[in-house]
Amino acid sequence: MNKPQLPDFIQNKIDHYIENYFDINKNGKHLVLGKQASPDDIILQSNDYLALANHPLIKARLAKSLLEEQQSLFMSASFLQNDYDKPMIEKRLAKFTGFDECLLSQSGWNANVGLLQTICQPNTNVYIDFFAHMSLWEGARYANAQAHPFMHNNCDHLRMLIQRHGPGIIVVDSIYSTLGTIAPLAELVNISKEFGCALLVDESHSLGTHGPNGAGLLAELGLTREVHFMTASLAKTFAYRAGAIWCNNEVNRCVPFISYPAIFSSTLLPYEAAGLETTLEIIESADNRRQHLDRMARKLRIGLSQLGLTIRSESQIIGLETGDERNTEKVRDYLESNGVFGSVFCRPATSKNKNIIRLSLNSDVNDEQIAKIIEVCSDAVNYGDFYFR
């Protein structure tokens, strides 16, 4: 039986993607897909910063909860907002970070999109850092808000935009997922107060790795009570597929009934909430892992900077700036051939000629591996067939 043919307007678009995203590369695959790593390679592609994904206590709690589960909650979380239905992990996460309220979501993407859809009216001014996560941009678009991008971490530019357009919502990441830079959170709080703006901080890449007991950068800086909203993907340090919204107001009462991602997606299941509870307990007592991760990240940042590479990172995320796609392909292949595997960030995550190979460190990385990465990058700098920006 013949398969149905796609209409030309779809087929032409797919042909364009295949030609420009796949066929153009040497291996015939997308640029993010390089060689297959071996067990001896240094793999820095995961966001599991405290190396908890295979923790035996978390696995045991998930298995036990799943085996004991008797409920059938395959429904929207909108129907489960009575106090007796809500998972205890929400109160524990609120206490952990110092916020009044926490609401679980199916992902960090859903948390950001749903929150902005809830709090924005059409034409609300959303002042968004140029490098903020795409889910924050999409949330503003969902709400028909007016997005005003400001230059990365440039508070003077932000002030100028607010003076021009009026109050709105300031939207930033605490740690940026491509370059590993840290937002000037204290100054952003001051700006939000000065101009009557709300402030939303996505702590996806700092929750668990920074702050007292891993409570995040806002907690570390004593700013929790000064910020209106915090969000996070729990698919980073928490090593699970979930997200959350924190607030110091009543917005989380409304999100489950206004946010399309909340209404039209099924709730997290009880065994998943139980797994998150155990993960939180481990994160709270993981100071040794956090300290080791910080030491390894500092050592690698210093070592790469001494090679003359442009390293803007202030965290465990380190971006090697590799320019255009053909050069990025060469750098990727060289690193992988020498046992170092990072994540390629290219269009649409970056602009076409500003690609990045991201090295995401975790607490299992050791001194010998850091030395190896620096050695491979040193050889790469002198190789001559490609360049670093």
From Swiss-Prot:
GO-annotated biological processes: biotin biosynthetic process
Protein's job: Required for the synthesis of the quorum-sensing autoinducer CAI-1 ((S)-3-hydroxytridecan-4-one) which probably functions as an intragenus signal.
Assigned EC number: 2.3.-.-
Any Pfam family the entry gives: Aminotran_1_2
Gene name, Swiss-Prot/TrEMBL: cqsA
Organism in which the protein naturally occurs: Vibrio cholerae serotype O1 (strain ATCC 39315 / El Tor Inaba N16961)
Keyword terms: Acyltransferase, Aminotransferase, Pyridoxal phosphate, Transferase
Listed cofactors: pyridoxal 5'-phosphate
Single GO molecular function: transaminase activity
InterPro entries: Aminotransferase_I/II_large, AON_synthase_class-II, PyrdxlP-dep_Trfase, PyrdxlP-dep_Trfase_major, PyrdxlP-dep_Trfase_small
Similarity-based family: Belongs to the class-II pyridoxal-phosphate-dependent aminotransferase family.
Modified residues (N6-(pyridoxal phosphate)lysine): K236
Domain of life of the source: Bacteria
Protein name as it appears in the record: CAI-1 autoinducer synthase
Extent of the signal sequence: none
